[in-house]
Amino acid sequence: MPGRQTVIARDSRYLDLATTLLQRMRLTSAAGGVWEAADVQWWSRAARSTDRDGQVFWLDEAGEPAAAVIVTDFGDTTQLDVLVGPAADADADDAWALALNRAEALRRRGAAIELPLPADSTAGARILTGAGYQPTGEDVIASWLDAARTPQVTTLAAGYRLHNRADTHDRSHPLVPRNGAGVAARLARCSLYRPELDLWVESPDGEVAGYGLFWPDPVTRVGLVEPMRTEDQHQRRGIARHILTSGLARLAAAGCTRLKVSSDIGLYLGAGFKPAIAAAIYAPPA
């Protein structure tokens, strides 16, 4: 059996390792950490400048991911996530040291660095403040809902129709305008993506009025909502509420017991989600 090792992973290997690590972390802590496995799969919907460098993982003696530093270029900001799984204390210091080094290198190239620090990471807070990092005042919100409390599916406005990607795969994906022509293929390679839970609403004139993507994780039984959008000309007609309640019902039917969204806007609070601060955003010294 090999000893512990460090690897650089890209593409499908990266997604597989990140998914396994985040699932292990969620199974260890029901409300700890920041992200779900589905989050990193959603982030892979488009090519990013940080893809070419790969992502660093520490593997345990069994070859399973124990810790990682994930760097994601979101355009305006570059986000660094330090993921430390259960029983990975031996790798934590190395992960934090690498994260700080990569952040400094990216900052020198002009990147605006953000580092979400989990609310339960006292060691991380000590390391970041010791390196001169400070909270920006912005937080990552995690809003949770027990699947048993899923609200009733609302009625869709007259003339509008709800579809899913499985039934409309011959049509351009609703996410193409904001995420590029390759988004459907990129989503299809994600292990947690389900086309029947990729919902969109068609307007009376045949256009996309809104959409929502719902991610069931059969390992953690957490269902993630990401993204949700109603186009401007179709606002205030109950479209988002219908997509949300339809998607939540389908997540529950898929076996999810807890539902999550990284937002605390009224749409989600009205559906029963309870928000909490999952992480504070830290930035490096100027």
Question: Which positions does each model-derived feature cover?
Answer:
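A short beta-loop-alpha structural element at the N-terminal edge
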Residues: 3-20, 161-173
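Conserved acetyl-CoA-binding loop-helix of GNAT-fold acetyltransferases
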Residues: 89-104, 230, 236-249, 253, ...
